[in-house]
A protein has these predicted regions:
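Active-site His/acidic residue clusters
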Residues: 1-32, 38, 69-70
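Structural motif
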Residues: 3-7, 55, 173, 204
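Short connector loops/turns at beta-strand edges and beta->alpha or beta->beta junctions
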Residues: 9-14, 179, 200, 206-210
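Extracytoplasmic/secreted cell-surface and envelope-processing proteins
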Residues: 14-17, 63-67, 117, 183-185, ...
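Secreted, luminal/periplasmic, and some membrane-associated catalytic domains
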Residues: 23, 34-180
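Soluble non-cytosolic domains of exported or imported proteins
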Residues: 23-30, 34, 118-123, 215-222, ...
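Substrate-binding rim/cap in mid-to-C-terminal beta-strand-loop elements of soluble/periplasmic
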Residues: 79-122, 190-232, 246-250
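Short, His- and charge-rich active-site/binding loops that engage polyanionic ligands
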Residues: 172, 176, 180-192, 196
Length: 250
C-alpha cells in the first residue's frame, strides 16, 4: 500500500490573521471544499474509490479572536514576560542573562550561567515556574524537571506533559488562560492551548469500503496511525501509543 500525506496550512494562517469568526475564514473553507472535491475527483479517476481510504482531520483548532467580543480579551506579552522573569532571577542570584529565549509557551534558561555559578538547575527551574504563575494571563507553569519526573494522569497537566519533548521543550512550559493569546502583530487568534476550542477537531475517514456512519464519541488522535495501519494491513508504527478505533475492527 501507498500512503500520501498532504498538509494544508492556509487555514491556520488565515484564522490567525482574521479570526475564526471572520468572513475571510468562511470564504477560505468554501474554497478549500471545492479544492478537495477537485482532488478527490482526480484521485477517483485514477483509482477505484473502494481502494482508497481518505482521512481528513486537523492537528489543532484555534482560539476565539481576542477582539471579537464587546470587551477585548487579555493578551500575553511574551517579551515582557521574558524580561521580568530574567529580572526576578537577577534579584535572586545576581546579574546575568538567566533567560535566553521564550518560544511557543516554552521558557529557556541559560544552563551555562547556572552551572558556572554552581547553582542547581532543578531549583532554578522551579523558582522560575513558581514566579511565572504570578504573571497575568498564565494559567499553568510547569518545570522541565516536573514534566520528566511526575505523572499527570488527567487534566491540563496531562496535556502539557503529552506535548513535552525533553530534547526541545523549555525549562518552564506555560499554558495561558482560556481565550488569552500571545500578543503579536496582525494576529487575532492563535493555536497551541490546552482548551477545547484548540484540542477538539473533526476526524473523517472515508472510502475503502468503510460503511457510512456518524460517531459522536470522543476519540484520541493517537488512534489515527494504528487505525490506518490496521486498514492497510501493515504493522503499526514502532512509537505508536494509540489503539485501533473499534468502529473499524472487522
Amino acid at each position: 500500500p501507498d500512503l500520501l500525506n498532504i498538509c494544508l496550512d492556509a487555514p491556520r494562517r488565515i484564522a490567525e490573521s482574521y479570526g475564526p469568526e471572520s468572513i475571510e475564514v468562511e470564504d477560505m473553507y468554501y474554497r478549500l471544499d471545492e479544492e478537495l472535491a477537485q482532488f478527490l475527483n482526480y484521485l477517483y479517476a485514477q483509482i477505484a474509490p473502494e481502494e482508497v481510504v481518505v482521512v481528513l482531520t486537523s492537528d489543532h483548532g484555534t482560539s476565539p479572536s481576542y477582539d471579537a467580543g464587546i470587551v477585548e480579551r487579555d493578551r500575553f506579552n511574551a517579551a515582557q514576560f521574558q524580561v521580568i522573569v530574567n529580572s526576578f532571577l537577577c534579584a535572586q542570584h545576581g546579574p546575568g542573562e538567566w533567560v535566553v529565549d521564550y518560544e511557543d509557551n516554552n521558557l529557556y534558561l541559560n544552563h551555562t550561567l547556572i552551572y558556572n555559578k554552581g547553582l542547581d538547575l532543578t531549583a532554578i527551574q522551579n523558582e522560575a515556574a513558581t514566579f511565572a504563575m504570578q504573571f497575568r494571563g498564565v494559567s499553568h507553569a510547569l518545570s522541565s524537571t516536573a514534566m520528566r519526573s511526575s505523572y499527570f494522569g488527567s487534566g491540563y497537566g496531562e496535556k502539557m506533559q503529552n506535548s513535552f519533548y525533553p530534547r526541545r521543550s523549555g525549562d518552564v512550559v506555560v499554558n495561558l488562560m482560556p481565550g488569552c493569546i500571545e500578543e503579536r502583530p496582525d494576529v487575532r487568534s492563535k493555536s497551541g492551548s490546552m482548551y477545547g476550542y484548540d484540542t477538539t477537531v473533526p476526524l473523517i475517514l472515508y472510502g475503502g469500503g468503510i460503511p457510512a456512519r456518524r460517531v459522536g464519541r470522543s476519540v484520541d488522535m493517537t488512534s489515527v496511525a494504528p487505525t490506518l495501519a490496521y486498514l492497510l494491513d501493515i504493522p503499526e508504527p514502532a512509537a505508536s501509543e494509540g489503539t485501533v478505533l473499534e468502529e473499524f475492527r472487522k
